[in-house]
Swiss-Prot record:
NCBIfam families: PRK05355.1 (NF003764), serC_1 (TIGR01364). The modification N6-(pyridoxal phosphate)lysine is found at K196. Pathway: Amino-acid biosynthesis; L-serine biosynthesis; L-serine from 3-phospho-D-glycerate: step 2/3; Cofactor biosynthesis; pyridoxine 5'-phosphate biosynthesis; pyridoxine 5'-phosphate from D-erythrose 4-phosphate: step 3/5. The lineage of its organism: Bacteria, Pseudomonadati, Pseudomonadota, Gammaproteobacteria, Lysobacterales. Homodimer. This is Phosphoserine aminotransferase. Binds 1 pyridoxal phosphate per subunit. GO terms for biological process: L-serine biosynthetic process; pyridoxine biosynthetic process. SUPFAM superfamilies: PLP-dependent transferases (SSF53383). It comes from Xanthomonas oryzae pv. oryzae (strain KACC10331 / KXO85). It is found in: Cytoplasm.
């Protein structure tokens, strides 16, 4: 059966070569006589898998030596609750910049554990733009400033790293990590659920400047303590080994493809095709996001009415273009163009958009 183009926002499309390698190695892996999902996470064989995944991720993202890397079970929402527990001292505030749905989720998760303050909120403008950093109201002694680098639902993306002075900048990079070069040294911490650009759902990556692990009060429960996870090489408890293995395969694939510089080029080309189809449609397709902050990863757009939205989703699925229905919070259509989406997928979508407009416009 021919694989369709999967535009799902997450879990998202994975490289076919990675899936086929995982398929081939599922029953018996690397000559050990058992599947990778059956061997001990503390065996020499799996420890080598884990070490290779970290080494390749460090190479892919140019992670400085003074930053620790954690591979954690669960997703970004869990991390959002753990950030204040690990990095905010009692009575200390933390600043949040709200640029979409996931920014709102981040502050909601943190609020029970820290004085979570809104430094800027783009909701008053309909989440169509990102307030400039110079306009943010930052607390001078804040534990950190939190941003969402790319909003998958509303389709806005920080195109430059904001300047926050000496305050640690924390960022949710779940949907844009490894999509272009990133100067990690400008951040105190970045994190990402794997299920968009790094691999399957169920595992996340946390990259943190080591000195930050030492300066704040620690959670009472060791399992929530990031310093403990770093000290135990992300194996404080049994990790999701299959997910970790697949993440490692995906990261290695990205390196083999040319790394983040190459994916930046590809992603710009893919986004240009879809935005070009929107902007050239004379209003039949609408994306209202300020062009300077349009997401390259997630492109939401709307047709003239909801009936056409539904017809677009139905006909596109029949044409082999999957998961284009917009998020329930906003409706419309959404195309996610993560690293594993080939240029041919973006071109097929742009062609379909033109054809659909010709027939229904």
């Amino acid at each position: 059966m021919t694989r369709a183009f999967n535009f799902s926002a997450g879990p998202a499309t994975l490289p076919e070569s990675v899936l086929r390698q995982a398929q081939a190695e599922m029953v018996e892996w690397n000559g050990v006589g058992a599947s990778i999902v059956e061997i001990s996470h503390r065996s020499a064989d799996f420890m080598a898998v884990a070490a290779a995944a970290e080494a390749d991720l460090r190479s892919l993202l140019s992670i400085p030596d003074d930053y620790a890397v954690m591979f954690t079970a669960g997703g970004a929402t869990t991390i959002q609750a753990l950030l204040p527990l690990n990095f905010a001292a009692p009575g200390q505030a933390a600043d949040y910049v709200i640029t979409g749905h996931w920014g709102k989720t981040a502050i909601k998760q943190a609020s029970p554990y820290v004085d979570a303050r809104i430094a800027a909120d783009a909701e008053t403008g309909g989440f169509l733009d990102i307030p400039p950093a110079a306009s943010w109201t930052l607390s001078p002694h804040s534990a950190y400033v939190h941003i969402t680098a790319n909003e998958t639902i509303h389709g806005v993306e920080f195109r430059d790293t904001p300047e926050v002075g000496t305050l640690p900048l924390f960022a949710d990079f779940s949907s844009s990590i490894a999509s272009e070069p990133l100067d990690i040294s400008r951040y105190g911490l970045i994190y990402a659920g794997a299920q968009k650009n790094l691999g399957p759902v169920g595992i996340s990556v946390v990259i943190v400047r080591r000195d930050l692990l030492e300066r704040a009060g620690q959670p009472r429960a060791d399992i929530f303590n990031y310093a403990s996870h770093v000290a135990r090489d992300s194996m404080l408890n049994t990790p999701p080994t299959w997910n970790w293995y697949l993440l490692g395969l995906t990261v290695k694939w990205m390196l083999e493809q040319g790394g983040v510089q190459e994916f930046a080029r590809r992603n710009a080309e893919k986004a240009a095709l879809v935005y070009g189809a929107i902007d050239g449609a004379g209003g039949f397709y609408r994306n209202l996001i300020t062009p300077a902050v349009r997401s390259r990863m997630n492109i939401p757009f709307f047709l003239p009415d909801e009936q056409l939205d539904a017809l677009f989703v139905s006909e596109s699925k029949a044409a082999g273009l999957l998961a284009l229905k917009g998020h329930k919070a906003v409706g419309g259509i959404r195309a996610s163009l993560y690293n594993a989406m080939p240029l041919a997928g973006a071109q097929a979508l742009a062609n379909f958009m033109h054809d659909f407009q010709q027939r229904h416009g």
